[in-house]
Amino acid sequence: MSLRAVSLACIMLVLAACSGGSQKKAGGVDPATPDQGCEGSCADTPTSLTVTDVENAIAQAVAEAQARGASATIAVVDRVGNVLAVFRMSGATTSITVSSPGTAVDGGLEGVNIVPDSLAAIAKAVTAAYLSTEGNAFTTRTASQIVQDHFNPLDSLQPAGPLFGVQFSQLPCSDLMTRFAGGAPDAGPHRSPLGLSADPGGLPLFKAGTVVGGVGVISDATYSLDVDISNVDADDDELVAVAGASGLAAPDLRRANRIAVDGRTLRFSDGSGNDLMTDPTVAPTFASINNVAGVLLAVPGYVTASVSAGTAFGHAASGIRPDTLDYPGLDAFVLVDSLNVERFRPIAGTDGAMALTAIEVQAILGEALTLANMSRAQIRRPFGTPARVSISVVDSNGVILGIVRGRDAPVFGIDVSLQKARTASFFSSTGAAAALNGVPPATYLNGGLVVLRKEPLSQYVTAAQSFLGLPNALTDGAIAFSDRAGGNLSRPFYPDGVTGNPNGPFSKPPGQWSPFSTGLQLDLVYNAIVQHIGFVLAAAPDVPTNCTGIDGFDNAFATAGVIGQLANGTQIFPGSVPIYRGNQLVGAIGVSGDGVDQDDMVAFLGVHRAGQSLGGFGNAAKPMRADTLTPQGVRLRYVNCPITPFIDSDEQNVCESK
């Protein structure tokens, strides 16, 4: 590397707080997969992880961990979350504690110390695979940067991260995510045991320019995140993962540190090949370490004690393939089951005579996908490529009416788009308050299976009604809540970003809030997450395919007051709007996969354009929208669209006056 290149890398490190630096591995060879110029179509050629790929990743990671005196648990997954292997080194910590750095936080998942190491490693691997595409390579360190109370973290005058709340998606209780059937890898997207991870140590894996999976590593006793990105960490989890990814590492031009959001460069990894203590190209074989340095694990609900090959993303076996029926000319992709039967073709709503028809649902999804294909992506490279998103439409009962995806959209957006749609529909309905008042409380753990306290969900209803100055809020359906508006109310500071401001009514106060204790969003699904941990520990049955209405461990996880409208949980960052026929709520649309302003625009304009085309439905009337409210003297936001969003047009302010 030239002196000029080194100088530029250092300057970028200081100015952008990105990982920068050399990407060389021990031995001086760049470990990044050569850039194939992939923009979303490379996966058309079936590409997947082989058994040898998985074994090599584990063997390389084990060698690096040994050199560091660390004992790690390592997981490898394919792009749709099939767990291909989990390997635990001798002496590895088997129980992990959830804990944020700094001042102790009281409640939520903070301090829970019974999380199996295997689940932490799997969650890290899934996160890296699900956040990455041919246009971007994100890691769990990237996730850490974009889910905290400020973006960038510790910048006390900046709003929360753009994907604030995404950590509680892909949940093990989701009715959308598929489950391990006990055999070979199959159709996904598969659930993640802890949602998405913000703990460094999860990296995506690439072959021939396309994402084929992820590797996750846990070698300490803490499942955490990085709250200070002004420095460069020497993190064993991350460096062991870097070694594991060698030979399958992300192309340099697609890495997070090549991508800026709101003028801030994202982080990829604080470690590179030059920081390794071993040369992965000469690591011992897997056969020589298996049952010597450690063992393959069987993880209930995820994998047997074996090594498997992954599925080829974008082809039927992966559960995601090109559409052949409903969206001609739109380069659409759909979800299918293990028999290649489409899971979510457009159907009519279930909520009575005013319900959306199948034709209307198809039109909404088609218009939204058309908009995404026209729009300039924020988080993909090269510049000028289209936004790639997942789009979900639900009715007012939360029933899935249709899901469609753009080419190479990130996998995480499937579950998140559904969460967003359901959240907008639920909080805009007449039954939200009663439903929240009727679910069991979140039973917080004090470390292990000891009750810290119980948190009733009704507290959030009371807080919202008081905060908004509307005694009938969440009961009369008078206000249309988008996810951007609901997100405003879910931040630990209101208005967002100013440390010391009061918390929103759906959030937690200081001392109780953290990314592992977000408020209503977590409390609604808390008991389900604990039950699933108990299942993996052979202490409870597995969680049902609904994340709500589950009581605490002290009541044997009994179910009561299940909220069908929120079966996969809620989401609290932008990208959804409710849908109306006149003033009658008939459902909602959720969009996820690119920048949040792009997600907002695709949802809002998708409904608008479909309604203009067919007539009879559309966005909420302006007097109903949440941006008519000014709680605490600060106006809520409804949607926020990019100023000049389209690739081949200079049209501006495309959402204005609609």
Task: Identify the residue ranges that each predicted region occupies.
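Flexible, solvent-exposed loop/hinge segments and secondary-structure transition points
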Residues: 23-658
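Short, conserved catalytic or interaction motifs in soluble domains
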Residues: 20
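Bacterial N-terminal signal peptides that target proteins for export
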Residues: 1-7
